[in-house]
Design a protein with these regions (language model features):
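Outer-membrane beta-barrel biogenesis signature
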Residues: 4-18, 30-32, 159, 166-168, ...
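Short glycine/proline- and aromatic-enriched beta-strand/turn motifs that initiate or cap beta-hairpins
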Residues: 11-70, 252, 258-260
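Outer-membrane beta-barrel pore domains and translocons
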Residues: 22-28, 61-65, 90, 102-110, ...
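Outer-membrane beta-barrel and related beta-rich outer-membrane complex signature
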Residues: 33, 70-72, 113-115, 184-186, ...
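Short glycine/proline-enriched turns and hinge-like loops at secondary-structure junctions
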Residues: 34-37, 119, 150-152, 168
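Outer-membrane beta-barrel transmembrane domain signature
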Residues: 43, 48-56, 94, 132, ...
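Outer-membrane pore/translocation modules
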Residues: 60-157, 240-247, 251
Length: 261
């Protein structure tokens, strides 16, 4: 398998293809617990490596339900798509210190919903940056959404990879998710006291990932994650909510692999 992957990578160069399929016990999307049942997610990227000018490509992210819990609301397979152009750039700051940037303009599509209002499309801009170094890696994400989902989402945290044995490694990370008042309402719901949410942190998550790098082209991973809603008012609002996945704290996990050509 390794020889086949290397052959495919050499044939594609300077073009690239990355595929990451995974199964998760639950699905958290931009700080909101969207589904507390198993989901299948696939992330695909393809493009051209322009060397010093970065990597130009396109991305596609799709979500499928692995249960029939919401069969009356939407179809099971591929009911949520995200796609758009991407640009990745690595800026070397010093020996072993690199600022990694990932910028995208994407569209989110929902399909197969019985409710016509849910069969909608909206667009967004997003930037991800991480300061890769041998110690602790800080990272953040900013997303600005448009067309009916007008909100700003922000995520920031730190992670650290520890080698265990040869190609086996573990990566603990912690991050907070926040955004504008519109994003807060999207995540938490309406306040129980009738007041308007202000901008702020809505949740904090702790993640532990175990990975095995079989080759430069193939790796597998498993993770466990603890999701926690922050703030007394937010917890009260979620406790009073009729939303099917209204949980103030939730433990989830998943398995997957990463293929790079």
């Amino acid at each position: 398998m390794q020889s086949l992957a290397l052959a495919a990578a050499s044939l594609l160069s300077p073009f690239f293809l990355e595929v990451t399929p995974e199964v998760r016990s639950s699905y958290v999307s931009s700080g909101k617990l969207m589904e507390d049942r198993p989901m299948q997610i696939t992330n695909v990227r393809a493009g051209y490596d322009a060397g010093d000018f970065g990597r130009f490509g396109v991305r596609n992210w799709d979500v499928s339900s692995l249960t029939d819990r919401r069969h009356d609301a939407h179809r099971h397979a591929f009911y949520h798509f995200e796609f758009g152009p991407t640009w990745e750039y690595d800026l070397k700051l010093a020996e072993e210190w690199t600022l990694k940037s990932d910028i995208t303009r994407s569209w989110t599509l929902y399909r197969g919903f019985e409710n016509d209002a849910s069969n909608r499309t909206y667009s967004w801009y997003q930037i991800d940056q991480a300061l890769a170094n041998p110690y602790i890696v800080p990272f953040y994400r900013v997303r600005k959404c448009f067309r009916g989902n007008d909100y700003v989402y922000f995520k920031a945290g730190v992670r650290r990879r520890f080698g265990i044995w040869e190609s086996l490694y573990v990566t603990p990370s912690v991050y907070a998710e926040s955004g504008s008042s519109r994003n807060y309402r999207r995540v938490i719901g309406a306040r129980t006291d009738g007041e308007r949410w202000s901008d702020g942190v809505s949740s904090v998550s702790f993640r532990l990932e175990l990975g095995w790098k079989f080759s430069e082209n193939f790796s597998a991973f498993a993770f466990v994650e603890q999701y926690e809603v922050v703030g007394q008012a937010a917890c009260h609002a979620i406790s009073a909510s009729s939303y099917r996945c209204a949980h103030n704290d939730w433990t989830l996990g998943g398995i997957g692999c990463r293929l790079k050509f």
